[in-house]
Design a protein with these regions (language model features):
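Catalytic-site neighborhood detector that most strongly recognizes the C-terminal catalytic loop/helix
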Residues: 179-180, 187, 245-249, 385-411, ...
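C-terminal catalytic core of Y-nucleophile DNA break-rejoin enzymes
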Residues: 242, 250-273, 280-304, 321-344
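N-terminal core-binding DNA-recognition domain of tyrosine site-specific recombinases/integrases
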Residues: 3, 17, 70-161, 333-339, ...
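Short, basic (Lys/Arg/His-rich) helix/loop patches that form interaction surfaces
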Residues: 123-127, 198, 202-205, 215, ...
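Short, polar N-cap/turn motifs at the start of nucleic acid-interacting alpha helices
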Residues: 229-237, 375-398
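C-terminal secondary-structure termini that scaffold catalytic or DNA-interacting sites
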Residues: 232-235, 245-289, 410-461
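N-terminal DNA-binding module of tyrosine recombinases/phage integrases
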Residues: 7-113, 307-322, 417, 421-435
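Basic, Lys/Arg- and aromatic-enriched nucleic-acid-binding interface segment
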Residues: 124-129, 133-145, 149-151, 164-227, ...
Length: 461
């Protein structure tokens, strides 16, 4: 039962409920009008009777998310980078704005306000939950629609669990998600790919880019290759290489949270006190495990590279630190993805004549080119790129380039229209203005005498 009590100018609703431990708890709620108090009393009694009463909780968004995140991580066996990414979303894009709000007081409009605020927020405004001082240039680069969509996706999942856990009756996350930002990545055509590769003198960068272009690899997959992945006699002597692992640098704290089930190797730290560590891990998805066919030119480069590794080790064998990776520095240490990226950026700075792209753009360039030369054989290209589904591949590379679309339009024109045929209607010839005799006589009746005289003269001549 619930009871209404008048206190001064307000009305209170007092009731008793049982908490999670079965303990009786008294609760008092205050309202400004008697009508509000009566409605709340009816609601409480109805919910207590049918078991839908929501136990009052003061847990905040921050407290809930920081409890939910590790549980999700353990349940779904997240990789360290996945945990790191989701933790960053919570710490930098959610907690600073709604972290102190109580879960049970959160409404859909609060989240709509959050999305609106984020759309006007510069990238990197918060790092590890701490507000950063940004330069004027940095303040001009705002969070993308895709990032805000990821915030929405995480909150939608988290708040569904809040309902399951009895913290909320209904999720306050809006039904409509923020729109993703769809931006076409800059890519290279075949001529640019070949010319760029030919101009790269750094042997590590040259091989990394060559492998990426042939196999449409991710940078972590390139860095994760080992000599054992190469099979020069595979595919009847064509030569193949396997993609079954990737290299990443991860936060040690994230690694401690997620465990090491997906970790194949942890590399020695270069610096003492580092908060990150370089790891070799299983690939992103099962479909990422694949075999790539070598080209004859790549095959020769790989053979020369393996000889180079032997020569490097022979120079100072006692100081050589063999990481076991295919891409190594002269001292044997692994070449990690960020170093490949830095080498590529440096090369681009020195060669402004090429379209500026990110290193991952090489994967897009390769996949796009392979789709074009295969005549759109999505399944064959998917086998090379390692996309999780054919739909994902099609959606990612729907643009295919303007050149191929122009050619498609030309082929349509040649195949659809009959030779010499035209569908353009001729414009009607504009006839000279005419007037009937009766209409002319009517005009003459009211005409000026001088006009009548001119008309008579014109008719006679």
């Amino acid at each position: 039962m619930a009871y209404i009590t008048k206190r001064g100018s307000s009305y209170g609703v007092r009731y008793t409920y049982q908490d999670e431990q079965g303990k009786n708890c008294n609760k008092w709620e205050s309202f400004s009008t008697k009508e509000e108090a009566i409605n709340r009393k009816k609601q409480i009694e109805h919910e207590l009777a049918n078991g839908t009463f929501l136990i009052p909780s003061t847990i905040t968004v921050k407290e809930f998310l920081m409890e939910w995140l590790p549980k999700q991580c353990n349940k779904h066996k997240w990789a360290p980078c996945t945990y790191q990414s989701n933790l960053g979303t919570v710490q930098n894009l959610i907690i600073p704005y709604i972290g102190d709000m109580q879960m049970q007081k959160l409404k859909p409009h609060h989240l709509e306000d959050l999305y609106s605020t984020l759309s006007k927020t510069p990238c990197g405004q918060y790092y590890e939950g701490k507000k950063q001082v940004l330069s004027e240039k940095q303040q001009q680069r705002f969070l993308s629609g895709t990032t805000i969509h990821e915030v929405h996706r995480l909150l939608r999942t988290a708040f569904q669990y809040a309902v399951e856990w009895g913290i909320l009756i209904k999720s306050p996350v809006p039904v409509d998600s923020p729109k993703k930002s769809i931006q076409e990545r800059a890519i290279w055509d075949a001529d640019e790919m070949w010319a760029a590769l030919a101009s790269m003198e750094d042997p590590i960068l040259h091989l990394a880019v060559h492998l990426t272009l042939v196999g449409a690899l991710r940078e972590g997959e390139v860095a994760g290759l080992t000599p054992e992945d190469l099979d020069f006699e595979g595919a009847d002597g064509t030569g193949t290489f396997r993609i079954n692992k990737c290299m990443q640098r991860v936060q040690k704290a994230s690694l401690a949270k997620t465990g090491k089930d997906c970790i194949l190797q942890e590399f020695e730290d270069k610096r003492e006190g580092s908060t990150t560590t370089l790891v070799l891990k299983k690939t992103k998805t099962a479909s990422s495990n694949r075999t790539i066919f070598m080209t004859a030119v790549l095959k020769e480069e790989l053979k020369h590279w393996l000889k180079r590794l032997e020569m490097d080790e022979a120079v100072e064998p006692e100081r050589y630190r063999n990481s076991g990776m295919l891409l190594r520095l002269p001292n044997g240490l692994a070449v990690e993805p960020i170093l490949i990226r830095k080498k590529f950026i440096k090369w681009q700075d020195e060669h402004p004549e090429f379209t500026r792209i990110v290193f991952h753009g090489l994967r897009h360039s390769s996949a796009t080119y392979q789709l074009m030369i295969s005549g759109g054989d999505v399944k064959a290209v998917q086998g090379t790129t390692g996309h999780a589904s054919a739909n994902l591949l099609v959606n990612t590379y729907a643009h295919i380039q303007k050149d191929s679309r122009k050619k498609l339009g030309k082929k349509f024109e040649e195949g659809f229209y009959k030779p010499g045929a035209t569908l353009v209607q001729a414009a009607p010839v504009e006839a000279e203005p005419t007037i009937s005799v009766s209409a002319l006589l009517e005009l003459l009746k009211d005409a000026d005498p001088s006009v009548k005289a001119q008309l008579r003269l014109a008719l006679l001549t």
